[in-house]
Each structure stands twice: as structure tokens, then as C-alpha cells.
Amino acid sequence: MTRNDLLDRLATTQASALETQGLGLVPMVVEQSGRGERAYDIYSRLLKERVVFMVGEVNDQTANLVVAQLLFLESENPDKDVSLYINSPGGSVSAGLAIYDTMQFIKPDVQTLCMGMAASMGAFLLAAGAKGKRSALPNSRIMIHQPLGGARGQASDIEIQAREILYLRERLNSILSEVTGQPVEKIARDTDRDNFMSGDQAVDYGLIDKVITRRS
């Protein structure tokens, strides 16, 4: 399988996932090459430029696709940055942590950019980008809060789930403290309820490094 075939398969799978989420049909682009015309879906074309999209809910399917693309781009060039564009309301903590761990694991720096909304795990992953390379567009909204969960069943089962949620809250707060420079105690207070921020407020908080109005 050639490089272009791998790119097509990865991005076409992502395109299908986005359509499944009700985000509409994915546009196609046509390029001229020495062998004639070639049609790409738009995500395949952008993946060739090392751009990965995380759009919609963070779930296992999203995580598998993002992780696969990050690993592939690392194998292509371990010294060239990857750009992760985020427009997400958040979702599964375990799926988000799979993406986070992969971002830290691979050699290339991962630049993150919020366009629209980065909430919950979306904001967490936005802040987890390489220091100095985390940004947002001017009208983006960023929201942090503590993990949500519910439990049912016997009292012992509910106790187990409660302990797990408390562990995840402490772990997420610890990571947010590392990437923002804020004390863990402040993170815990600020994530007790939904905490919305503008791009400039997110810069002051340390979640991102800059607000971008135009491509440089």
C-alpha cells in the first residue's frame, strides 16, 4: 500500500465518521499530477499537510482515528509538527486521555488550534498541545469543568464508580495544573462548575498561548 493510499484510508475513515455524526457530506478536491487527475476528500488532502481534525464528540471512534493519524504522521516525519484543529463539546474521559497520551508519546510537536468550541475534554486536549503552539481563533469559546458521571446498582458498585470519578478528577486537575501553570487548588475551584472563557481569558489562564486573527 502506497503512502497516498494510507492517507486516503485514514482520512476517508474520518470523513465517514463525521458523516455518521450528522456533520454532512464531505467535499472532494481534484488535483493534477503527472499521472493525471486525482480526487481526494478534503480531509485526505489536509492530512497530507499534517492537519488532523477533532470535530464533534470525543468518543472511542474519534480517539482511534486521531491516534492513528498522529502515529502515521510521526512515522512519515518525526521532526515536523502536526496541527490538531479542535471544534468539540468534549465527551469520554478515557477516549480523551488516549489522545492526550499519544500527543505526549509521539516525537513531533502537536500544535493545537480551537475553532468554534473546545469544551471539557476538547479544552483539555487544546491545552495539552506543545507549549508556545496552542492557539484559538478570535470568537472561539473554551470551557473547563470537572468530569461528569453517574452510577447505578448496588451500594458497593456506586462506591467504586464514585472513587473512579474522584481519581479522574484529581488526575485531570493535575495535568491541567502542569500545562497551565495554575495551582492544583485553583484548578479544582475553577472546574467545580462549567467555566467558560474567551480566547484572551484562556491565554491569561494558561490554557493557550495566543489568539490568532490571521494566518502568519
From Swiss-Prot:
EC number: 3.4.21.92
Broad EC category: hydrolase
Chief site of localization: cytoplasm
GO CC terms of this entry: cytoplasm; endopeptidase Clp complex
Location of the protein in the cell: Cytoplasm
Keyword terms of this UniProt record: Cytoplasm, Hydrolase, Protease, Serine protease
Reactions catalysed: Hydrolysis of proteins to small peptides in the presence of ATP and magnesium. alpha-casein is the usual test substrate. In the absence of ATP, only oligopeptides shorter than five residues are hydrolyzed (such as succinyl-Leu-Tyr-|-NHMec, and Leu-Tyr-Leu-|-Tyr-Trp, in which cleavage of the -Tyr-|-Leu- and -Tyr-|-Trp bonds also occurs)
Matching PROSITE patterns: CLP_PROTEASE_HIS (PS00382), CLP_PROTEASE_SER (PS00381)
One Gene Ontology term from the biological process aspect of the record: protein quality control for misfolded or incompletely synthesized proteins
Single Gene Ontology MF annotation: ATPase binding
Residue ranges crossing the lipid bilayer per the database entry: none
Keyword Hydrolase listed: yes
CDD domains: S14_ClpP_2 (cd07017)
Disulfide feature: none
Family: Belongs to the peptidase S14 family.
HAMAP family: ClpP (MF_00444)
Subunit structure: Fourteen ClpP subunits assemble into 2 heptameric rings which stack back to back to give a disk-like structure with a central cavity, resembling the structure of eukaryotic proteasomes.
Protein name: ATP-dependent Clp protease proteolytic subunit
Source taxonomy: Bacteria, Pseudomonadati, Pseudomonadota, Betaproteobacteria, Burkholderiales
